[in-house]
A protein has these predicted regions:
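Beta1/beta-strand and adjacent pyrophosphate-binding region of the FAD-binding site
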Residues: 1-15
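Conserved N-terminal glycine-rich FAD pyrophosphate-binding loop of Rossmann-like flavoproteins
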Residues: 37-57, 61
Length: 411
């Protein structure tokens, strides 16, 4: 049996590195494992919304965010078939802006911070099985590193392996897919914004949208995502959905002089936190493994870092109590639910409306004419406000309802 630890973390993405960073700072002897060598490419939209940038800054990386080759955005534009909304991003302690940074770089930097805090990192090491005591309590895990199996003892394991499906993870439904490619020389109306597109073709497909996020080095991340349920109903595949987005008239114009860099890459997402367990005796899950991707924006980095920070705090508390029971670790899941539950639940409500754009388009049009409502809508996309904050603008719903009734009467 290998060396003993206070905590073993499976997966060195944002959630795992955050857990290892905060746990090490709290004095826990922490081992961080990942199947891959870092840095490594990670398909993603690459956007760091303001709340995510705040979490990154809390890990001591505020100056790194400001490096000149990083993309910055101070506005968000949403285009639907009949409406156009543009708002500045919500201000944070780090400033009224978000960032666009390749995940390859972000993840490597977060891992560097975890190691600088004292965490031990082992790459090319795949966790395979939880170890348990004769009484059934978690006692560590087994891993493969190319040289045969190796065991690591620890009373606590945090699973942060995304959709990897490690045995200790809580199974969650992968309910969305996305695809992105990098292009150099992308046009566009305002490169200080991130751009969200909900085109007529996408509306007919259901809950999906496209995006253009500008990096700071002349490239842009151009992608599209859709719920697996909506995609299945169309009979199309993700590549076709993405290619048709690139052929939209506005996108075709933006890409007219652009050159692709590298292949398009796809990935699966566990969006929305409802229905997933995040703890059991001796185990907590964080980030994508805990289904914490925002149900509207698809952003997961900020929630992963936040959940890692909370999990590390509860790992420290469990060691203080010398109690690693499910009852103790339920404090982590409860705290996460209190902080993000209503936001995710209301986000699901909006996503469930997306396949019925006859209802949603009038709402977007009404929001476009009301500054407060349009800000609330944009902030719901970024995860900086719950969708139900729109209820503070009843006149918008009245206008939208009038529009819907008028459309029905004309039909």
């Amino acid at each position: 049996m290998g060396e003993g630890y206070d905590l073993v973390v499976v997966g060195a993405g944002p959630g795992g590195s955050s857990t290892a960073y905060y746990a090490s700072r709290a004095g826990l002897k922490t081992l961080l494992l990942d199947r891959q060598e870092f840095p490594r490419d990670k398909p993603c939209g690459d956007g760091l919304m303001p709340h995510a940038a705040g979490e990154v800054a809390m890990m001591g990386l505020g100056d790194w965010l400001e490096e000149p080759h990083h993309g910055r955005f101070t506005g968000i534009s949403i285009r639907t078939a009949t409406a156009s909304i543009r708002q500045g991003v919500p201000p944070t302690l780090h400033g009224p802006r978000g960032y666009v940074i390749r995940r390859e770089e972000t993840d490597a930097k977060l891992l560097e911070r975890a190691e600088s805090a004292g965490a031990e990192f082992r790459s090319r090491t795949r966790a395979t099985k939880l170890l348990r005591s004769p009484a059934g309590a978690v006692a560590g895990l087994l891993a493969e590193n190319g040289g045969g199996p190796e065991g690591f003892t620890a009373p606590l394991v945090v699973v942060a392996d995304g959709v990897g499906g490690f045995e200790g993870g809580m199974k969650a439904h992968q309910n969305a897919v996305a695809r992105r490619q990098y292009f150099r020389g992308v046009g566009g109306s305002d490169k200080g914004d991130i751009h969200i597109f909900m085109t007529e073709d996408m509306n007919s497909s259901g809950a999906g949208y496209g995006w253009v996020f500008y990096l700071g080095d002349g490239r842009a991340n151009v992608g599209a995502g859709i719920s697996t349920r909506s995609l299945a109903k169309t009979g199309r595949n993700l590549k076709d959905f993405y290619d048709r987005f690139l052929e939209e008239p506005e996108m075709a114009e933006w890409l007219r002089d652009a050159e692709p860099e590298g292949p398009a890459k796809s990935w699966s997402l566990k969006m929305g936190m409802w229905g997933a367990r995040r703890h059991e005796q001796g185990v907590m899950t964080v980030g994508d493994a805990a289904s914490l991707i925002h149900p509207i924006s698809g952003e997961g980095v900020g929630y992963a870092i936040e959940s890692g920070r909370l999990a590390a705090s509860w790992a420290h508390e469990a060691h203080r109590r010398k109690d690693f029971s499910a009852a103790t670790l339920s404090g982590y899941a409860s705290q996460l639910l209190r902080q993000r539950g209503r936001e995710h639940l209301s986000g699901h409500a909006l996503v469930n409306l997306m396949p019925n754009m006859e209802l949603l388009e009038p709402l977007f049009r009404a929001c476009a004419k009301d500054g407060g409502a349009s800000r609330a809508l944009v902030e719901s996309f970024t995860g900086d406000a719950p969708v139900y904050s729109l209820l503070k603008h009843p006149r918008v719903f009245a206008r939208a309802l009038k529009d819907v009734v008028g459309n029905l009467q004309r039909a």
